[in-house]
Amino acid sequence: GKFSVYNSLCAIAVTRHFQVPQETLKKTLAEVKVKGRIELVKVSDEFSLMIDYAHNAMSLKSILETLKEYNPHRLVCVFGCGGNRSKERRFEMGEVSGKLADFTIITSDNPRFEDPEAIIEDIKTGISKTDGKYISITDRKEAIRYAIEHGEPGDIIVLAGKGHEDY
């Protein structure tokens, strides 16, 4: 997305300052992958699934706007919000996904000491400000399984919030 472009431009500026050979820079930029950032995971020949660490409204908006530019059949967003964090963040993320995704699957994402269902209800409050379609599946593994099993040709499914984390 745009943040990756900005980060690459910063890297170019630093390498120029330190006189790193241009071929080294080209090779590195072509090969660099940041685990959990717009990470494509092959699960189907029919649709795309991406993992991204987007865990606030600004980063979720950025990744969804970027992926919409590819004109998917549907843009499906699977995400949750962490517990013991701002409720406002939950409302905002729900609203962003409701506006930009064609379908949202709300799930749990490290609830810490909070009830996962209460967190999901907060996210629903944000989505309810939009016309966005959604379901909630508390168990994250089940939510991901649902997204994959219901993927349609041309869809882009983004698993947002946890990036490379596996807990």
Question: Residues of each region from the PLM?
Answer:
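Nucleotide phosphate-binding/pyrophosphate-handling subdomain across enzymes
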Residues: 1-103, 125
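Generic enzyme active-site microenvironment
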Residues: 50, 78, 107, 137, ...
